[in-house]
């Protein structure tokens, strides 16, 4: 006899990965509760859907729960975790709960160091346009849906697969995407890159014999693991041996135009002329993954083309806030926000900004995320930050880590001055960033706010400041 689970509690329910699973469970008819240190858009949405959300962690919050879901950000000494264990309430890792959802449907899991959220969103959008009505769980807000999760009536669930804590090895999907493999979250893998690559090989081994691994062969590390993948593979990218291949890619007014050549199972599919409503070569690659999945699932070509042309993007992934007035009223600047926090992601986003807004001054307001990442990627950060025209650099967002000597915002500032590529302005308190941006901008500038921490609130503050000034 199965233990009947009706009430599920989430510790850290406002997190991107947690809130999506919570919403799907609510839609499945479960009673959902949760707690978080503060309120955000995700907690407010869940509360409006019927979840009981507590602010702050307390042992009493787990009362009545049949299961308690935790992410790796939740420590073992959390009072709710301690209370659950004391009361013998099962404590379930987030990835295990996601795996349970995947058991209900056919899973499409999107993995890779960079591009997971955008690729997952593109796959979900294309499948939805093709009439497959997928369930999806995304690490960002899909603008067209107004949410980061939805319960569909179709056979498929599309979700991100997180390698940061190796939790993607809990999943058993029928289709997988690997966008790229890069050195990040190396603490999980003992700072051994070979172990990280082996984890991705093991991820492909989770597929059934009839499953498909969709791999970006433009990435050298993905290409390196190809000989060790024993399941059927679909290669995508710009490379000549890609089965789903982009050619003639070019930037046009903030969009990407390209042609897709498809060769699957020894059969040439008709080429597709694509207009992707996103900037950047990296997003062409993300779209190719979605095209590969859709082609395998026999989504009509017209639906693929329409979904990509009308794609409305994902929150904090090159999210355009439009034009904001300069403080003196002499003109406006274009405001864009992005979640990028690894040098490779940042370089791709900044290249996309240059392509979308050629011949304009590029101003970057960046908040590094985690002291360990700043330490491990220090020289790469200096290199990519030196490519902009003006730089506002915040202190590192700790994300629970202790400071590391010579791996903070001041150290980056000093190194950038020595490199003499750009003169950084160090903004120690993130609360001062909106004013620092207003002090630095000129009419016609493109301002990109970037980072995975609290800098995500800055664009909204700039827009609110302007609206307040106009009233």
Curated annotation (Swiss-Prot):
Cell wall formation. ATP binds at residues 112-118. InterPro entries: Mur-like_cat_sf, Mur_ligase_C, Mur_ligase_C_dom_sf, Mur_ligase_cen, Mur_ligase_N, MurCDEF_pg_biosynth, UDP-N-AcMur_Ala_ligase_MurC. Gene3D superfamilies: Mur ligase, C-terminal domain, Mur-like, catalytic domain, NAD(P)-binding Rossmann-like Domain. Its EC number is 6.3.2.8. Keywords: ATP-binding, Cell cycle, Cell division, Cell shape, Cell wall biogenesis/degradation, Cytoplasm, Ligase, Nucleotide-binding, Peptidoglycan synthesis. NCBIfam families: murC (TIGR01082). This is UDP-N-acetylmuramate--L-alanine ligase. It comes from Cupriavidus metallidurans (strain ATCC 43123 / DSM 2839 / NBRC 102507 / CH34). It is found in: Cytoplasm. Belongs to the MurCDEF family. It comes from the Bacteria. Its main location: cytoplasm.
């Amino acid at each position: 006899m199965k233990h009947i689970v009706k009430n599920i509690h989430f510790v850290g329910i406002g997190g991107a990965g947690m809130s999506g699973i919570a919403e799907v469970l609510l839609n499945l008819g479960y009673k959902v509760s949760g707690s978080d240190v503060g309120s955000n858009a995700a907690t407010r949405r869940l509360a409006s859907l019927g979840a009981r959300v507590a602010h702050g962690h307390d042992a009493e919050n787990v009362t009545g729960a049949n299961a308690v879901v935790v992410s790796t950000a939740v420590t073992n000494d959390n009072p709710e975790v301690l209370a659950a264990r004391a009361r013998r309430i099962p404590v379930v890792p987030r990835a295990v709960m996601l795996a349970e959802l995947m058991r209900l449907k056919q899973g499409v899991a999107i993995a890779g160091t960079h591009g997971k959220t955008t690729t997952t969103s593109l796959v979900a959008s294309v499948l939805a346009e093709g009439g497959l009505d997928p369930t999806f769980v995304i690490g960002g807000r899909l603008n067209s849906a107004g949410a980061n999760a939805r319960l569909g009536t179709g056979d498929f669930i599309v979700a991100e697969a997180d390698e940061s804590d190796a939790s993607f090895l809990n999943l058993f999907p029928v289709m997988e995407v690997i966008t790229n493999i890069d050195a990040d979250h190396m603490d999980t893998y003992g700072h051994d890159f070979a172990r990280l690559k082996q984890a991705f090989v093991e991820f492909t081994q989770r597929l059934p014999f009839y499953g498909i691994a969709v791999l970006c062969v433009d990435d050298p590390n993905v290409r390196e693991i190809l000989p060790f993948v024993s399941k059927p593979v679909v290669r995508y990218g710009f490379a000549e041996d890609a089965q789903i291949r982009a050619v003639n890619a070019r930037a046009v007014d903030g969009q990407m135009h390209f042609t897709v050549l498809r060769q699957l199972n020894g059969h040439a599919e008709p080429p597709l002329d694509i207009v992707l409503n996103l900037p950047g070569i990296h997003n062409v690659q993300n779209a190719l993954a979605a095209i590969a999945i859709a082609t395998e699932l026999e989504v009509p070509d017209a639906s693929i083309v329409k979904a990509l042309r009308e794609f409305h993007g994902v929150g904090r992934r090159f999210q355009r806030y439009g034009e904001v007035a300069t403080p003196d009223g002499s003109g406006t600047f274009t405001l864009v926000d992005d979640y990028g926090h690894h040098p490779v992601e940042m370089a791709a986003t900044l290249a996309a900004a240059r392509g979308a807004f050629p011949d304009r001054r590029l101003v970057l307001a960046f908040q590094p995320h985690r002291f360990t990442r700043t330490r491990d990627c220090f020289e790469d950060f200096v290199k990519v930050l030196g490519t902009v025209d003006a730089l506002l650099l915040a202190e590192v967002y700790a994300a629970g880590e202790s400071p590391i000597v010579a791996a903070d915002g001041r150290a980056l500032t000093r190194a950038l001055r020595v490199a003499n590529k750009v003169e950084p302005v160090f903004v120690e308190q993130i609360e001062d960033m909106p004013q620092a941006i207003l002090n630095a901008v000129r009419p016609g500038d493109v301002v990109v706010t970037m980072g995975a921490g609290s800098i995500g609130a800055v664009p909204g503050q700039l827009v609110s400041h302007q609206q307040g000034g106009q009233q």
